[in-house]
Amino acid sequence: MRLRKLELQEHQASQSLYEEVFSEDSARFVEYYYTEKTKDNQIYVIEEDGKIRSMLHLNPYSLWVNGSRKDANYIVAVATQKEYRKRGYMASLLKKSLEDMYQAGEAFTFLMPASESIYLPFDFRTVYEQKKRYYRQEEPSEDICIKEATDADCKELAEFANKYLAEHFQV
């Protein structure tokens, strides 16, 4: 077993594992992800027999916390080939990536797990649950106006969201 961080020019080598484990993602999304998102991310892997068997991606994000910009990494694409699971690979990848983020002075990281129980042993906790609401235009309400957002609405929606979040949370 060999744990290492891939060099930028090696990132593409993890795509076949991504496609195997995240088969629900469309080919178009995977192409976008490996063309755009892996330009500036970090990919930790575990290799056996010269092949990538497990991986973890750190995608960089800038966050606003208490009016200050903070750089953080979003943990994504944590995957292990089925026949290599239950060997502690995910734990090793998490430990190494968390150590590296700590050494780099990063105050926190985050992820959106498929199942919260997977990450509880690593002290990750749910800090936010997104509520989903569905409205149909056929059901008019005096309080709610429903219309499809256009590209022109994006700036106004972002400003509204940022104002609301700043007033209600420390972001």
Enumerate the language-model features and the residues they cover.
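Conserved active-site alpha-helix within GNAT-family acetyltransferase domains
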Residues: 103-107, 113-131
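A conserved beta-strand-loop-helix scaffold within acyl/acetyltransferase catalytic domains
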Residues: 3-78, 163-171
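Alpha-helical elements of Rossmann-like donor-binding domains used by nucleotide-donor carbohydrate transfer enzymes
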Residues: 13, 17, 96, 156-159
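Short coil/turn motifs at secondary-structure junctions
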Residues: 61-63, 83, 116
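Short active-site oxyanion
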Residues: 98, 103-109, 145
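Conserved acetyl-CoA-binding loop-helix of GNAT-fold acetyltransferases
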Residues: 75-101
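Amide-forming acyltransferase catalytic core, primarily the GNAT-like/NAT-type
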Residues: 126-171
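Long alpha-helical, hydrophobic tracts
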Residues: 90, 97-103, 115, 151-152, ...
